[in-house]
């Protein structure tokens, strides 16, 4: 439970909890008996209450084999996505004859907990890209810093700066193209790189760098 909130908190995503239940009008769509389903659904309700989390109930949203707690994330455009999920499965273990040995040395049926924190990597990345609109936080950005040179006279100094950044495990790119510095800056901003470092002859002479963040 805690890992879900920690994981999505790092991504600055607000979560809403949904208790996904059977469709009471169509019990034939689900595996197992009604008693097991009632027990599993009530256990998930208790988990939500114990954690003092507001939740909504969604009949018909359960998997065909189990009820579940779905964590719904809201992206920067206000759209809702199901991300993490916790399922209490009382049906599949029996179908695979899964048992454990209880305290009396006897075989006993088990209940299986399915937990998907992130789900598929591809789906998670699509949600996170939409959420940040490409402007990833510094720690998540594929390129954290981009070095822009004013001319080729400053390349030696620029490479010294790059070496220091790479030694500090900062993901860095180097733009030493024969283009105007204005164009390089505009392209860096369009790429939504957190920090642009601009190096000209003034910076070389002073042994400094000029830093421009994504906000401009």
Please state what every model-predicted region is.
Residues 1-216:
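NTP/phosphate- and nucleic-acid-binding module
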């Amino acid at each position: 439970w805690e890992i879900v909130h920690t994981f999505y908190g790092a991504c600055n995503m607000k979560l809403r909890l949904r208790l996904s239940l059977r469709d009471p009008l169509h019990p034939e769509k689900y595996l197992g008996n009604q008693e097991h389903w009632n027990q599993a659904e009530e256990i998930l309700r208790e988990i939500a209450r114990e954690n003092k989390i507001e939740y909504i109930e969604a009949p018909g949203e359960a998997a065909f084999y189990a009820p579940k707690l779905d964590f719904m994330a809201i992206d920067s455009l206000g759209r809702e996505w199901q991300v993490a999920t916790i399922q209490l499965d009382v049906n599949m273990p029996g179908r695979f004859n899964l048992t454990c040995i209880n305290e009396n040395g006897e075989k006993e049926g088990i209940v299986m907990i399915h937990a998907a924190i992130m789900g598929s990597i591809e789906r998670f990345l699509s949600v996170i890209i939409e959420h940040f609109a490409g402007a990833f936080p510094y720690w998540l950005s594929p390129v954290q810093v981009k070095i822009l040179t004013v001319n080729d006279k400053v390349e030696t100094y620029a490479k010294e700066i790059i070496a220091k950044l790479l030694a500090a495990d900062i993901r860095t790119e180097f733009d030493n193209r024969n283009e105007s510095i204005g164009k390089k800056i505009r392209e860096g901003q369009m790429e939504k790189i957190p920090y642009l470092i601009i190096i000209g002859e003034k910076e070389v002479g002073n042994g400094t760098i000029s830093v421009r963040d994504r906000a401009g």
